[in-house]
């Protein structure tokens, strides 16, 4: 049994009677599996240990619980499919799921969160929402020119925030396309350990600020599994407007385009590709320093490379040892560009593994090790890692 399986089993044993331990083994292959427990128990859920080595916040951890809500008929269909084939049931998307969790790190960053996704009419209408509150202590970087020299200013920030994000989507006929509306609302307070920066933010943003945004989104999705796809594509584009008219203290716009694809190279090998482009337009002279988009790659600190334009490209090659175990190698490149023609590029790569912990749902849990030229980190992931 793998280490993630042992940890998940231990956490689960604290919540359920010992007599139900047999439900943690798959009836088809006899391996450790939590699919039966999630589906057949009223309080069944997947406990997800959170191991944090994010360079931006330091070492830490937490725990999350993933609840998959299905009707009796949906459970019956999934169970029958899982008993007939090794990959049976994994292509069926649960009509509703929820997640709750909490985490904390050594630099006193902490967060409590929850989310829910629900679909109706055979996934013709879909709602996704989530919220949380906590404190994030992170370093931010600002690049500027002084004469012929390019200088980087580093300053610590502490952001206390409570926020809500939600969206509703509607399917276009029987196609893989969905269109919808998005909303984001957050109330935050940002402080800095740099006295000059702190006074500047207090003067321009006030002691507290409200972020309120509305937007539109289009999404195309043909992936064969929501959690760990091995075939198919996903493309999405959204445009968010943050404006005083809808209650925001800051005025800015953000365009976000992202895509990912999974190409079976052979029976054992799968090639994954992912890309992201963001374009940020600032209407006010001053906004919260965390509002700008940043390069998001495994092995790179969050908010380390921010810009008005952000581009990332990633590739991942996965090998299936068997239907339970997967190993992978990945590499990515990112670029953050400011309006003043200043840009930063960063490359990062690493290796990882996954264990299929709930076969009838296609849920994979595992770890990634990644590093860039100046940082390294370990990630405890559920899903592909993109």
Residue ranges and their predicted role:
Residues 17-19:
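N-terminal signal peptide c-region/cleavage motif recognized by signal peptidases
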Residues 207, 214-321:
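C-terminal outer-membrane beta-barrel translocator/porin domains of Gram-negative envelope proteins
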Residues 269, 340-348, 356-386:
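Predominantly the C-terminal beta-signal and adjacent terminal strand-loop region
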Residues 45-47, 96-100, 125-129, 177-181, ...:
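Transmembrane beta-strands of outer-membrane beta-barrel proteins
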Residues 38-45, 51-206, 291, 307, ...:
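Gram-negative/organellar outer-membrane beta-barrel architecture
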Residues 54-56, 70-72, 121-123, 173-175, ...:
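Outer-membrane beta-barrel channels and translocator barrels
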Residues 70-72, 103-107, 134-138, 186-190, ...:
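Sequence/structural signature of outer-membrane beta-barrel proteins
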Residues 44-46, 60, 109-111, 159-163, ...:
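Transmembrane beta-barrel architecture of outer-membrane proteins
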């Amino acid at each position: 049994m793998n280490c993630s399986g042992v940890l998940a089993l231990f956490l689960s044993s604290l919540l359920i009677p010992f007599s139900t331990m047999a439900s943690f083994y798959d009836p088809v292959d006899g391996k450790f599996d939590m699919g039966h427990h999630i589906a057949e128990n009223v309080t069944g859920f997947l406990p997800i240990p959170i191991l944090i080595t994010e360079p931006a916040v330091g070492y830490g951890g937490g725990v999350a619980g993933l609840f998959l809500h299905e009707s009796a008929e949906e459970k019956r269909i999934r169970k029958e499919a899982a008993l007939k084939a090794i990959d049976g049931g994994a292509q069926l998307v649960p009509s509703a799921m929820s997640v709750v969790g909490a985490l904390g790190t050594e630099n006193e960053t902490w967060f409590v969160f929850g989310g829910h996704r629900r679909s109706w009419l055979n996934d013709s209408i879909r709602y996704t929402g989530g919220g949380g509150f906590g404190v994030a202590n992170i370093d931010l970087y600002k690049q500027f020119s002084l004469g012929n020299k390019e200088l980087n200013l580093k300053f610590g920030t502490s952001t206390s925030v409570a926020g809500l994000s939600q969206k509703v989507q509607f399917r276009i006929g029987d196609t893989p396309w969905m269109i919808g509306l998005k909303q984001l609302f957050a109330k935050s307070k940002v402080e800095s350990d740099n006295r000059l920066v702190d006074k500047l933010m207090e003067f321009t943003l006030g002691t507290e600020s409200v972020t309120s945004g509305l937007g539109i989104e289009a999404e195309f999705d043909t992936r064969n599994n929501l959690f760990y796809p091995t075939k198919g594509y996903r493309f999405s584009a959204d445009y968010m407007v943050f404006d005083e008219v809808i209650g925001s203290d800051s005025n800015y716009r953000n365009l976000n385009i992202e895509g990912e694809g999974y190409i079976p190279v052979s029976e054992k090998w799968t090639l994954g590709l992912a890309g992201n482009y963001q374009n940020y337009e600032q209407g006010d002279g001053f906004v919260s320093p965390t509002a700008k988009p940043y390069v998001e790659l495994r092995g790179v600190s969050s908010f380390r490379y921010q810009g008005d334009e952000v581009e990332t490209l990633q590739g991942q090659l996965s090998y299936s040892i068997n239907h339970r175990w997967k190993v992978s190698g990945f590499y990515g490149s990112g670029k953050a560009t400011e309006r003043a023609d200043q840009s930063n590029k960063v490359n990062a790569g690493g290796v990882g593994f996954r264990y299929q912990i709930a076969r009838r749902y296609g849920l994979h849990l595992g770890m990634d090790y990644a590093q860039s030229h100046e940082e390294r980190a370990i990630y405890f992931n559920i899903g592909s890692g993109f």
